[in-house]
């Protein structure tokens, strides 16, 4: 099947069981990527749609690219949409969305994924290493409590050790938000770290 801008699969990270599952993109293509696809994924995978706390284990965080990611389309080739029940909104959290730019969405798309659905809650801190089709959950107790900069350095050094010496590692990209519990780190080989 021709996907016309889509990679054809979405990565579901079940943090409770530490399993990575590939979801077919086809049922979500009609939502167009980004906010539409993220909202559809949220409503399909969120088990309790009445939650009002973004930190609740039933919350689902969807990080979704678009069919234009990695293209030269101005203002569209590098945006990534994040959808779910927000954290820390006053007076209560609610279903919301945000987006960010940079190379994350492009690199995720190049790795063969149209998005990531994160659900559940890990029983201890973990980070998830995504390199193209391979997904590995790593213990992250040594990162817990560190600030953003220290976390970046620690994961970057770990990624270098995990990579082959013949590969280039000069192109690291960090997007880490330790306070809210989510950290992502794509590299040229597309590693994404997610600490919960």
Spans of model-derived segments:
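Short, basic and Ser/Thr-rich N-terminal targeting/leader segments
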Residues: 4-6, 56-59, 178
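Short helix/loop capping segments that flank catalytic or ligand/cofactor-binding pockets
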Residues: 21, 71-74, 170, 193-194
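Thiamine diphosphate
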Residues: 101-102
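Extended, non-catalytic structural segments that build the interaction scaffolds
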Residues: 77-98, 185
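Active-site cavity-forming subdomains of large catalytic enzyme subunits
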Residues: 94-95, 105-196
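Non-catalytic, usually N-terminal nucleic-acid engagement modules in DNA/RNA processing proteins
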Residues: 24-55
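N-terminal leader/transition segments
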Residues: 1-28, 32
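Conserved oxyanion/phosphate-binding beta-strand-loop segments in alpha/beta enzyme cores
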Residues: 43-79
């Amino acid at each position: 099947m021709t996907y016309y801008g889509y990679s054809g699969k979405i990565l579901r990270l079940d943090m409770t069981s530490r399993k990575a599952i590939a979801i077919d993109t086809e049922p979500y293509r009609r939502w167009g990527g980004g906010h539409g696809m993220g909202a559809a994924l949220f409503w399909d995978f969120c088990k309790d749609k009445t939650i009002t706390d973004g930190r609740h284990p039933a919350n689902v965080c969807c990080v979704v690219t678009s069919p234009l990611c990695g293209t030269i389309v101005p203002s569209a080739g590098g945006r990534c949409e994040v959808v779910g029940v927000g954290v820390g909104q006053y007076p209560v959290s609610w279903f919301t969305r945000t987006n960010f730019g940079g190379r994350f969405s492009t690199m995720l798309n190049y790795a063969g994924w149209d998005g990531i659905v994160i659900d559940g809650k890990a029983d201890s801190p973990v980070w998830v290493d995504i390199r193209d089709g391979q997904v590995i959950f790593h213990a992250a107790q040594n990162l817990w409590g560190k600030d953003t900069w220290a976390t970046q350095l620690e994961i970057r050094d770990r990624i270098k050790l995990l990579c082959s010496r013949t590969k280039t590692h000069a192109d690291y990209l960090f997007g880490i938000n330790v306070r809210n519990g989510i950290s992502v780190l794509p590299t040229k080989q597309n590693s994404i770290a997610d600490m919960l």
